[in-house]
Amino acid sequence: MRTLFFIILFMPFISLAQKIDKVKVFLDCSWRCDADFFQREMTYIDFYKDPKTANLHVIVNGERSSNGGEIVTFRFIGINEFEGVDNTLTVDILPNTSDDSERKFYLDILKKGVYAYIIRTSDKDNV
């Protein structure tokens, strides 16, 4: 009886200890993303071409702003182990920004957004 009590008592903690090794990203970008650049710079996460194998769906959309620049929105949607962990980050790119600076801005936003998921993995200390 005592053993059964302890099993029932600690069952929620056993399920919380489910191990998430790495963030697996499906990048869904309809706005000037350099996916190869992101993959080279962010080797601590895995990029997938199939959203069913990922645990994080990142949707990137952009639009022209009234000043001639761009407003780019990154939506981070948790899948599977990260279900319910969703975030949105936006960057405003000025009209005279170089292509290289622009992709570095995007990389910075992507890194910041993915960090919220990395800290929930067992790989967090290796980043």
Enumerate the language-model features and the residues they cover.
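Bacterial Sec-dependent N-terminal signal peptides
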Residues: 1-20
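Amphipathic beta-strand/beta-sheet edge segments enriched in Tyr/Trp
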Residues: 56-106
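Short helix C-cap/helix-to-loop transition motifs enriched in small/turn-promoting residues
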Residues: 7, 51-52, 67-68, 79-85, ...
